[in-house]
Amino acid sequence: MVHMHITAWALGLILFFVAYSLYSAGRKGKGVHMGLRLMYIFIIVTGFMLYMSIVKTATGSMHMWYGLKMLAGILVIGGMEMVLVKMSKNKPTGAVWGLFIVALVAVIYLGLKLPIGWKVF
């Protein structure tokens, strides 16, 4: 399940940057954007399934940390969607990029720090 979730995130980020580059170039990126929205659903479903499997065995404050990671992941998805919608409407995206970057760094840090992640920290 972890590998499906990581693969979904990788594909989601690739589709996000492809759609962003299409919107930046002034071309239509609607098809890629719709594919990205499908990946959002897959990311959320696999993340929720991981969270439910962790809740059964986690002890101490692990529930809270995984809950915060899930919240930050949803903020990343929201930030990605807001960036693309604002780009498609030719509106400024500075603040939304800030939300996206901060949430993405938080998700990556928590993903590497928590027990299921890699032991980098």
UniProtKB/Swiss-Prot annotation:
Kindly list any coiled-coil regions of this protein. none
Q: How does it sit in the membrane?
A: Multi-pass membrane protein
Q: Which domain of life is it from?
A: Bacteria
Q: Where are the transmembrane segments?
A: 6-26, 38-58, 65-85, 92-112
Keywords, in A-Z order: Cell membrane, Membrane, Transmembrane, Transmembrane helix
Q: Where in the cell is it found?
A: Cell membrane
Q: What's in the GO CC field? A: plasma membrane
Q: Which family does it belong to?
A: Belongs to the UPF0344 family.
Put simply, this protein is called UPF0344 protein BCE_1257
